[in-house]
Amino acid sequence: MKRLFLIAFLALLPSCNGIFPGIYDSGESDLVTGYGFIAHNPSDNSGKVYIDATDYTKWVYLDFHGRTAVTAGMSEEEVPAEWDIAVHRYDVKTNGAAVLETGITGLELFMSSGKMPEGEYVEDEWTTEKIIVDMSGMMDGNIGYSESWYNPELSKWLKVDTSTMPPLYSMSHKVYAVKLADGSNLALKLSNYMDASGVKGFMTIDYVYPVEF
């Protein structure tokens, strides 16, 4: 039993990501250099974000207004003044936004719809058991969590099934419609969760902001 827990622990560590590339992973390993907002097309407001979200003790705060990415610790004192969504590993929270998972799989198709989709947009919820920050006690059944806001709808962009070892990763491949707190709209899609070498936690996000039909 202890050996099984050890295998599970090693499989979940960031440093062990990519041990079984191409077998258990559904992401594509495209070579990307640089971090943050790495591409932006002003003609259609589309762009691409590439971030390192491998650290369990960090949030990466994304400001789509200013196209900036800031990595900070878990405390509220470290939260930047301007941000729209933040990523912790595969978890996501928003700065007062509401999110809808659409059935659309491409941003161009989303924009061709001509309007923001209707539906039940989901706001953040407070959680004490979603944001993992310490797995050092996993073998003893002790996992450390951080209390935090969490958006369950946007966090659907990547499912991690830990019922088998190594875990199975599957992206939703869907576009998420985000109504930001200032009334502007954002559309985004997770297109990868690995770097070129297969290490998990390196997130590539395609987006359109502001969404203007």
Model-assigned labels for residue ranges:
Residues 12-15:
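C-terminal motif of bacterial Sec signal peptides marking the signal peptidase cleavage site
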Residues 1-4:
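Positively charged n-region of N-terminal signal peptides that target proteins for export
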Residues 17-213:
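Surface-exposed, beta-sheet-biased, low-hydrophobicity segments with strongly acidic/polar composition
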